[in-house]
Amino acid sequence: MSKEKEEIKIIAQNRKAFHDYFIEETYEAGIELVGTEVKSVRQGKVNLKDSFARVENNEVILYNMHISPYEKGNIFNKDPLRPRKLLLHRHEINKLSGYVSRKGYTLIPTKVYLKRGLVKVELAVAKGKKLFDKREDIARRDAKRELEKQFKEKQLGI
């Protein structure tokens, strides 16, 4: 296997997290799933809306991540919103608990993806944005878009 960038297939993204939070740092975590949940994730039936993680008893638990029941799973299907354990190294968990203990910081999943056949979650340490921060970001984005438009028109000689 080459040392180049590994193949990653993104299953779900939490775009709203980038709008509602300042992302400080991201971590890659494995996730503890049962067989029918893995099959459902591979079909792309995952929703990260309103999901978050907490550090409890030196474990990171993910809440409110919706994985739709697998159609052919019948009795083996679990509750779609059940809490799921995230798999991280001890030093990463200690670092995350240090971040979360500070006021205003939380853990938000930003992506669910497949890496070498394994389901992974990108977990972000995030701080909530205030309303004026969101407006500021929108104004900055609009100004950048306007500048690019003017530059493009100038290049084309319009």
Swiss-Prot record:
InterPro entries: SmpB (IPR023620), SsrA-bd_prot (IPR000037), SsrA-bd_prot_CS (IPR020081). GO terms for biological process: trans-translation. GO terms for molecular function: RNA binding. It comes from the Bacteria. One of its GO terms (cellular component) is cytosol. It is found in: Cytoplasm. Its main location: cytoplasm. Keywords: Cytoplasm, RNA-binding. The keyword Cytoplasm applies. The keyword RNA-binding applies. Gene3D superfamilies: 2.40.280.10. Required for rescue of stalled ribosomes mediated by trans-translation. Binds to transfer-messenger RNA (tmRNA), required for stable association of tmRNA with ribosomes. tmRNA and SmpB together mimic tRNA shape, replacing the anticodon stem-loop with SmpB. tmRNA is encoded by the ssrA gene; the 2 termini fold to resemble tRNA(Ala) and it encodes a 'tag peptide', a short internal open reading frame. During trans-translation Ala-aminoacylated tmRNA acts like a tRNA, entering the A-site of stalled ribosomes, displacing the stalled mRNA. Belongs to the SmpB family. PANTHER family: SSRA-BINDING PROTEIN, TMRNA-BINDING COMPONENT OF TRANS-TRANSLATION TAGGING COMPLEX. This is SsrA-binding protein. The gene is smpB.
